[in-house]
Amino acid sequence: MIIIKDAHFITSSSQLSQCPASLTSEMVVLGRSNVGKSSFINTLLGKNLAKSSSTPGKTRLANFFSTTWEDKKNALTTTFSVIDLPGFGYAKVSKSLKKEWEGFLWELLSVRTSIKLFIHLIDARHLNLEIDKNAKENIQTLLRSDQAYLSLFTKFDKLNKNEQHRLFLNAPKPFLINTTHFNALSSKYPTLEIVRQTLLKYLLTNPL
């Protein structure tokens, strides 16, 4: 069982020079605006640290969090960071600001060697959107041998049972499923504990 020993906010940044030092392995959370990134991070860390905006795409900062997890089963304690990226597909942003914003994010993902895992949140109700395909392709062009990419489907509990089963069978692997409270809808769907164990495994495979 994984116990969350600590989780806290570090800082927000809109420029590479403002980002905190890379002292631990890092996990990046990315996805379209309004896909549920804040809810996912807060549930994952067991604290309401990530703030969501009522206006999709309003948040223009990369937010950094630190957390310490204790894996009781393996007698292992690990500290790592979570980077919450601004949602993409945003609206009402000037072209110059959009270009500057995208440049910062691309530079951040390209040069920050402490990033070990990319978590791409995808709305289970809207699969195969071009914007998600492009995001996946862009991230995969950046991947080094010590990094991993993982899809995680949000709003899974809003699908009917047939849609859930179809997604579970046909979605590209590897992937995880995030329900509203991470309660398993049946024994074959991952619980919060399984999600945490899976993410920790990826982070520990290529430690900083």
UniProtKB/Swiss-Prot annotation:
BP terms from Gene Ontology: division septum assembly
GO-annotated cellular components: cytosol
Record-annotated membrane-spanning stretches: none
Disulfide bonding pattern of the chain: none
Essential cofactor(s): Mg(2+)
Physiological role: Necessary for normal cell division and for the maintenance of normal septation.
Family to which this protein belongs: Belongs to the TRAFAC class TrmE-Era-EngA-EngB-Septin-like GTPase superfamily. EngB GTPase family.
Amino-acid positions noted as binding GTP in the UniProt annotation, renumbered to this chain: 31-38, 57-61, 84-87, 154-157, 182-184
Amino acids binding Mg(2+): 38, 59
Gene from which this protein is expressed: engB
Domain EngB-type G: 23-205
Name the record gives this protein: Probable GTP-binding protein EngB
Lineage top rank: taxon: Bacteria
The entry's keywords: Cell cycle, Cell division, GTP-binding, Magnesium, Metal-binding, Nucleotide-binding, Septation
NCBIfam families linked to this entry: GTPase_YsxC
GO molecular function: GTP binding; metal ion binding
Organism: Helicobacter acinonychis (strain Sheeba)
